[in-house]
Each structure stands twice: as C-alpha cells, then as structure tokens.
Amino acid sequence: MLLLLLLGSLTIVFYIWQRRTLSFWERHGVKYIRPFPVVGCTREFLTAKVPFFEQIQKFHEAPGFENEPFVGVYMTHRPALVIRDLELIKTVMIKKFQYFNNRVLQTDPHNDALGYKNLFFARSPGWRELRTKISPVFTSGKIKQMYPLMVKIGKNLQDSAERLGSGTEVQVKDLCSRFTTDLIATIAFGVEANALQDAKSEFFYHNRAIFSLTLSRGIDFAIIFMIPALASLARVKLFSRETTKFIRSSVNYVLKERERTGEKRNDLIDILLALKREAAANPGKMSKEVDLDYLVAQAAVFQTAGFETSASTMTMTLYELAKNEALQDRLRQEIVDFFGDEDHISYERIQEMPYLSQVVNETLRKYPIVGYIERECSQPAEGERFTLEPFHNMELPHGMSIYMSTVAVHRDPQYWPDPEKYDPERFNSSNRDNLNMDAYMPFGVGPRNCIGMRLGLLQSKLGLVHILRNHRFHTCDKTIKKIEWAPTSPVMASKRDIILRVEKVSGKKDFGQK
C-alpha cells in the first residue's frame, strides 16, 4: 500500500513537472510545435527515424510556421528555439555574438579529454584564445606551403582511379574517404596513412569508426546533441575508447619524433609544439591546461572534420555530376583548358577555376554536410540582456539552446528558385546580384564558423580535378535514385552506399562517349 502511494505521488509530481515544463512556450506567447511527454518534439530522432539535422529541418519547415521568425520546440523536456528569419540569424551569429559564443554540444570534461578540450567543443572564454593560436595553420600562406603535399595525394587518387579499370562500379564515398584520410594524415601529422593503397589502413579504419555508430555510441551522441547537461553524469565520449587510444598514441609519437629531429613542416604538429613550448615557458594556469590530451584533442578534431566533410562534398558532387553528365563534361573541359596534359595542378590556377567553384558551391548549397548550426544563449549577470526584439519582447533564459537549419535555408525557394535542382549556374558571377548570400552558410556563420573552410574547399577541389580529368562517372543499376539519410550519423550521410560506374577518358574526343 505504501509503495502504491509512493508511486502515485511520484506520478503526480512527474505529471505536474512535465505539464509545467512543456508549457514554457505557451506561457511566453511564442508559437511552438506541440510536444509529446518525455520525448518532447524529438520523437523521430530519438526513435532513429531521422538524423538530428533532419529533425531540425522538420522544425524549420513545419506547416503553419512559414511566416514565423522562429519556432518554439522541446528537446525532450528542454525548451529550445529554432530560428527561421535571416536577419535574426545574423543577429545571433554575428551582431550579438557575445550572447551566443558557446556551442550547445558538450561531452564529459572528466572522462573525455579529447572531446571536451578540442576547439569545436571548447567554451568561452578559452575557445577564442585557442582559435587564435590554431588559426595560423589555416591561413592562405600556410595552406600554400602545404599544397605540394596535397598534390602528391591527389596524384595517388588519380592512380587509384586508374587501377580500378574502365567500367568498374565503385563505392564513391569509400574512395573519397581514403583520399581525405591520406591527405589529412600527411598535412596534419606528417605521416603516410596509405589508405588509397592499403585496404586495411589503420588510419582509415579509425576515421571511419568515428562515424559508424553502434547503439551505445548512438546514445552518447543523442546526449551530446539533445541533453548535454547529462554529459558528465552519463560519462559520454566523442570518440570511442579504441579510437581515443589510436589518436593519442599516433599524435604522441609524431610529437616526440618532431621534437627529436627538429623537422619543420609548417603543419598542425608545428603549431601544437609551439603551444607546448609556450606552456613550458609560462608555468601556471597555461601549463596545467596544455597537457598532452589538450594537444591531441586539437589534432583529433582536425582529423575528424577534415576526413568526413570533404569526402562527403566530393561524394555528393560526383553523384550529382553522374546524374547530370553535361555538367560533368563542362567541368572536365574546364580542367583540360586550365591544365591540359600538365602533370602539376598549380595552387594559383586551381583557385582561378570559375566553374569548379560554382560546382562545389552548389554541392554545399544542396548538401551542407553538417546541416544545422547551434548556439547556447549566455545572459550576463548584470547589464543589457538579449531579447527577441523586434519580433518579441521575450528575454531568452540563460543556457537556452538555439538552432538554425542550414539545409532548410539552402532549400528555401524564397532564396533559391527550384531548390531541389542541382544548378551550378546559381553561382555564376553574372548571377551574383540575384543571390542572397546571407542564405548560404555551409561553413557556419560568424566568429565560430569553420576554421578549416579554406582547406576543406581546396582539398575537395583538388580531389575532383585529379579524379575527373581522366575519368567519367556514370549512374548504373546500383545507383540509388533518391538519397535517404542515415539516421544515426551526426552529419549528412547517405543511408545506402552511393555506387557509380567509372570510365576512363583519354582526351577531349571521348567527352561525348556514354
């Protein structure tokens, strides 16, 4: 009897708490999506029907909210805001950035040093200092110094395509991922991963494992995305134990070798060694923060982001060009016009290719790899606080999560006519005056945008030039007609393999051959 009474009391308390919690937006007069008990508005994501970015996209595109500047939602029991209006997005991401300089995502600071200490997850005020110290490796000058190393990997990709043989049906993401694995290993760590040559490359195995989620890893990511306040209690980790061990041992080895030999490569390892020396020269707080895991964490996020984003961009580009072979032939003609039979793809010339830029820009419009942007509201204890004016007089609570769907904005016919059509001509210089570039944000917006944007674009372009100059990609019987997104992936990734048929092209005369 006592147990039943206790259970009844707990049920009543839970009901009252849920009702109070899930009435937040109604009480504040904000239009919202009606939540379900316990799961809030995220039932599709939590039941693995859609990936997280698509859940945010569905919020943005929910019927009845077409003219609303924002949408109130519930991430399980936590109120959150999905911003739809471009001016409000600019306000949050740029003009009033001081209120939104932290990301929502968090991992366990006590048990996940590689996740918690890296630049992507770093919180204010430490993130700004860390970004300032790491950013030199991503400047145009440093990238140009690393470019010869990148070209070597590009030639390896070209050779790998040659070895496939004409008429081979290839799993495109696998090929592109091996290219980006080798490239990142070379320019970031100064090691040869040999993923293009070795089917069992250890580097490639661990890179792929980061995005291959088991049930337990899926739960970790659900907490990181949805309920970051539970990250410490649930002891969630960004990287698995096996991957953490591999990255830590690899980076530690390279750091020691570089210190022993004194070699300079103008790469990420040089930057990390400079941080280590600075910490040693300034004992105190900095020396406590800059330990081995702090250094390894920066290399880990560099490796992860560089591997997946560029590989996905290349994959989706080849998929679209295989479906639109006239566009593919036009790009190949530009490659021939710029380089002919030259062995070397020069840094300056690849930057000057207008149609290549149009193609990559259009891929990133239709497929912005992360798919959404998130920030956490940080209200000051004193002074002016952030409100939703002029749309609403509500003052956002400290710690509230804010989301923006880049996919929804990039596919909004208000900004992009016929948005489902793959059309590189949108980005033709003659059409520039017709574009609203505020509606284009594949690398994020504001001071916390993607630090590796230049490098990511360059490695995608370099890979495409090397693989398309002598090869044509066709659809085949195994090519999927419509992409369904993998519900457990933290980024935009096809649920099924994208398979294309590759043919050797020996020159201009072959361009029309099918």
UniProtKB/Swiss-Prot annotation:
One of its GO terms (biological process) is insecticide catabolic process. It is found in: Endoplasmic reticulum membrane; Microsome membrane. Its cofactor is heme. Keywords: Endoplasmic reticulum, Heme, Iron, Membrane, Metal-binding, Microsome, Monooxygenase, Oxidoreductase. Disulfide bonds: none annotated. GO terms for molecular function: heme binding; iron ion binding; monooxygenase activity; oxidoreductase activity, acting on paired donors, with incorporation or reduction of molecular oxygen. Heme binds at residue 450. It is a peripheral membrane protein. SUPFAM superfamilies: Cytochrome P450. It comes from the Eukaryota. It holds the Pfam family p450. GO terms for cellular component: endoplasmic reticulum membrane. Its EC number is 1.14.-.-. Belongs to the cytochrome P450 family. May be involved in the metabolism of insect hormones and in the breakdown of synthetic insecticides. This is Probable cytochrome P450 6w1. It comes from Drosophila melanogaster (Fruit fly). The lineage of its organism: Eukaryota, Metazoa, Ecdysozoa, Arthropoda, Hexapoda. The gene is Cyp6w1.
